[in-house]
Design a protein with these regions (language model features):
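Short, solvent-exposed segments of well-ordered alpha helices
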Residues: 1-9, 74-81, 104-111
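Short, hydrophobic, well-ordered secondary-structure elements
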Residues: 2-26, 114-124
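Short non-catalytic regulatory patches outside canonical folded cores
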Residues: 15-85, 92-97
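Intrinsic-disorder-associated interaction segments
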Residues: 37, 106-109, 164
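Substrate-binding/catalytic groove segments of enzymes
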Residues: 82, 91-103, 124-135
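Short amphipathic alpha-helical surface patches that serve as generic macromolecular interface elements
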Residues: 84, 88, 114-117
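Amphipathic, Lys/Arg-enriched alpha-helical patches that create a basic surface
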Residues: 106-152
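Acidic, Ser/Thr-rich low-complexity intrinsically disordered segments
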Residues: 144-180
Length: 180
């Protein structure tokens, strides 16, 4: 539908921007001028090896790995398509029949939008963790300020550290993240 297509375009654009930001934080030599998804994948794989296989959980019931097929496709153009390829197809060539008999824009469906949104959530959590590490915000001098947590998604790699009435703290690869 057109609504899914618009959502996919907006989410995909945010993923592109935040991927570049994450790569520039985790690799001080990252060239932001020459950046595309294959470059992001290589940098993230090298610096954050658990990222591609991390799972996003929807409302504590359904688990999926939104980045796995994206990373596989970055290394092998013949790999099964992912939400990222659909996003690019919609962005650059909406009416082409790149994925079977359907025009690309018809691949803008609930599943691809959900995978894109889960991928964006995962990126945001890793970005937050790297900012906390970079600026050493996980210590006694700078008490963590809570951020609003997602009512839809959680990351499998984030484990509950402790829970209070007003917020919860999670351990995310040894970094504390406080969420409301």
């Amino acid at each position: 539908s057109i609504a899914y297509m618009k959502l996919l375009l907006e989410i995909g654009s945010e993923v592109d921007i935040l991927s570049k930001q994450l790569c520039s934080i985790i690799d001080c030599n990252f060239n932001t001028e020459q950046s595309k998804m294959p470059t992001y994948c290589r940098t993230i794989d090298r610096m954050l090896p658990n990222f591609r296989n991390d799972s996003v959980i929807i409302r504590r019931k359904h688990e999926f790995t939104p980045w796995l097929k994206v990373f596989e496709h970055c290394g092998n153009q013949n790999a099964e398509y992912s939400w990222w390829q659909i996003y690019n197809g919609v962005k650059h060539n909406r009416n082409a029949c790149e994925y079977g008999n359907l025009p690309t824009y018809k691949m803008s469906n609930q599943q691809n939008v959900l995978f894109a949104l889960g991928a964006l959530f995962q990126l945001e959590m890793y970005y937050l963790r790297e900012v906390i590490k970079l600026y050493q915000l996980d210590n006694q001098i700078y008490p963590l300020q809570p951020i609003v947590s997602s009512s839809l998604f959680t990351l499998k790699s984030m484990s509950l550290y402790f829970e209070r009435q007003t917020y919860s703290e999670y351990l995310f690869h040894d970094i504390r993240v406080r969420m409301i």
